[in-house]
């Protein structure tokens, strides 16, 4: 019976892989739901599916997009997506939101805030999986990229949502990372999270609309000066600062031309493929870390002592390092 079940699973996975490759719009969400699942039997099927589709992936340009609060990220992503479709691309939009379980996610929001893109036959929008942990969301997003590329989408836009380490996670899974910011009076770096500027490959001052155009150009000059202090003169790529009005549709072509130029520069130096290989290795170790953490959380003895250990750490009776050591010993993850 077990062999028959395995054979049936193989048939199901083969059929799903064929359907995804063929661009079946109904098969794609089924495949994505499978890779998002944390059930052990689903994880096994998902890995078999990914193994079959991996040779068909890798041809898309993966672009991460983050932004300061109020920058109009959704409007910008939709405008860029529609612009790319007009240029003959097939565009997928993913969100990385580690808070999606706690907040209820943006399952309705993604499609209502990008209404035109959501209904276009050459676009696909997928809200963040409701994993509740950044590691879980990151894993599901990386695996979803493989499915989307195998399905023929040649541009994958990955949006960061919420706060925390989502920018770093997205930067580690894309080819080009774009930071959207606003023209601000005074210090132009105000509102940009510490460290995010160093992650960016391209910086865009959005909402350069009408009377704000001059202010946006001034902000772009100030940001360019700041970036020159971060990157040495001999750097392979120094992030350019562009101005854009997503509402008016200005600057979209320049943004995408810059994304393509970034890829050309990296490819010419042999860095594009090297970056992707490094990301695969990074992904491997992230999966190891996630698996070890899952093993610790699921250990029944750890669950029994967790509250008491946390209480003692809060009370100052136990250092975090000693508490961690006890947890690892209980979970049989030390060399003692």
UniProtKB/Swiss-Prot annotation:
CDD domains from the UniProt entry: MMAA-like
UniProt keywords, alphabetically: ATP-binding, Chaperone, GTP-binding, Hydrolase, Nucleotide-binding
UniProt binding sites for GTP: 67-75, 209, 245-247
Molecular-function GO term, any one: GTP binding
Superkingdom assignment: Bacteria
UniProt xrefs under InterPro entries: GTPase_ArgK, P-loop_NTPase
GO CC, alphabetical: cytoplasm
SUPFAM superfamilies given in the database record: P-loop containing nucleoside triphosphate hydrolases
Enzyme class: hydrolase
EC number: 3.6.-.-
Keyword set includes 4Fe-4S: no
Pfam families membership: MeaB
Cited NCBIfam families: lao, PRK09435.1
Assembly information from the UniProt record: Homodimer.
Function: Probable GTPase. May also bind and hydrolyze ATP. May function as chaperone.
Protein name per Swiss-Prot or TrEMBL: Probable GTPase Rv1496
Annotated organism of origin: Mycobacterium tuberculosis (strain ATCC 25618 / H37Rv)
